[in-house]
Swiss-Prot record:
Gene name tied to this protein: MBP
Post-translational modifications: As in other animals, several charge isomers may be produced as a result of optional post-translational modifications, such as phosphorylation of serine or threonine residues, deamidation of glutamine or asparagine residues, citrullination and methylation of arginine residues.
GO molecular function annotations of the record: structural constituent of myelin sheath
Compartments where located: Myelin membrane
N-acetylalanine, modified sites: A1
Modified residues (Symmetric dimethylarginine): R107
UniProt organism field: Pan troglodytes
Pfam family, one: Myelin_MBP
Modified residues (Phosphoserine): S7, S12, S19, S40, S56, S76, S115, S162, S166
Residue(s) carrying Phosphotyrosine: Y14, Y69
Taxonomic classification: Eukaryota, Metazoa, Chordata, Craniata, Vertebrata
Functional note: Is, with PLP, the most abundant protein component of the myelin membrane in the CNS. Has a role in both the formation and stabilization of this compact multilayer arrangement of bilayers. Each splice variant and charge isomer may have a specialized function in the assembly of an optimized, biochemically functional myelin membrane.
Family (UniProt): Belongs to the myelin basic protein family.
Modified residues (Omega-N-methylarginine): R43, R49, R107
Protein name: Myelin basic protein
Amino acid sequence: ASQKRPSQRHGSKYLATASTMDHARHGFLPRHRDTGILDSIGRFFGGDRGAPKRGSGKDSHHPARTAHYGSLPQKSGHRTQDENPVVHFFKNIVTPRTPPPSQGKGRGLSLSRFSWGAEGQRPGFGYGGRASDYKSAHKGFKGAQDAQGTLSKIFKLGGRDSRSGSPMARR
């Protein structure tokens, strides 16, 4: 029992405080950029829906690139251009895991922040945990280690791309 309790507490504590920990401890890492994305996404889910569609049809590819790697906080004033592709990218990641559509803003912000934060710190927690669950469920108990080997390969090889592709491919 004494072994079980700390691990459980640690698990739930991590889940509960993932976003705050990220911002406090890792503010200086690239994650700092993501807050720009997350903010605009929160606004998008909150009701900016009409604005991004207006001028962004043609530009959608380039802003998506700059948005992910570059100057989000400065750009967020320009939301008509970079929001649409960015949000599209995030929706693909976030939607499979969001049961309550009613939450709106909270959904976009907390969910995407949690998944980014978690996988930044410990690949096993975000999609990693889920993917290995699925895989080990199929293969049985022996497959659990296999699944993790595969996962680390995926994370090393494709990083962001393979991860955003896999949940969609699976569903």
